[in-house]
Amino acid sequence: MHPFQWCNGCFCGLGLVSTNKSCSMPPISFQDLPLNIYMVIFGTGIFVFMLSLIFCCYFISKLRNQAQSERYGYKEVVLKGDAKKLQLYGQTCAVCLEDFKGKDELGVLPCQHAFHRKCLVKWLEVRCVCPMCNKPIASPSEATQNIGILLDELV
């Protein structure tokens, strides 16, 4: 490839020889673009697609978790901020018998007993009572009201 090819064969591109001939770039159409430009455009499109796919999966999983908590009537907390108000540090999950650790996702029932969220969902699929006190869990309409009351109490 000649170094002058991009400048229509004249020396203006390198500034080596002064010439009276006017030098201008030829118009470039989309079909004349080099292959690497197509690769950049294609790669950017794939990147944006993958990023949007990741966001969609994240929001779908969040919606699924929210639907489970509304279905079974428990409030979801992360053992970080809300756990201090509920005094959950050092306690044990009654379902799996493991201690609560930092950033664990917990489910808090209307009776104020807390469990790991996954443990609680499995328990509530089998029995609709609290694993600690055997208090029945309210129906979904009552559970929504109870969750609102619990949220107001925690804030």
UniProtKB/Swiss-Prot annotation:
GO terms for molecular function: ubiquitin protein ligase activity; zinc ion binding. This is RING finger protein 122. It is found in: Golgi apparatus; Endoplasmic reticulum; Membrane. A zinc finger (RING-type) spans 93-134. The chain crosses the membrane at residues 40-60. It comes from the Eukaryota. Signal peptide: none annotated. It comes from Homo sapiens. SUPFAM superfamilies: RING/U-box. Its main location: Golgi. It holds the Pfam family zf-RING_2. May induce necrosis and apoptosis. May play a role in cell viability. The gene is RNF122. It is a single-pass membrane protein. Widely expressed in several tissues and cell lines. GO terms for cellular component: cytoplasm; endoplasmic reticulum; Golgi apparatus; membrane. CDD domains: RING-H2_RNF122. One of its GO terms (biological process) is protein autoubiquitination. Keywords: Endoplasmic reticulum, Golgi apparatus, Membrane, Metal-binding, Transmembrane, Transmembrane helix, Zinc, Zinc-finger.
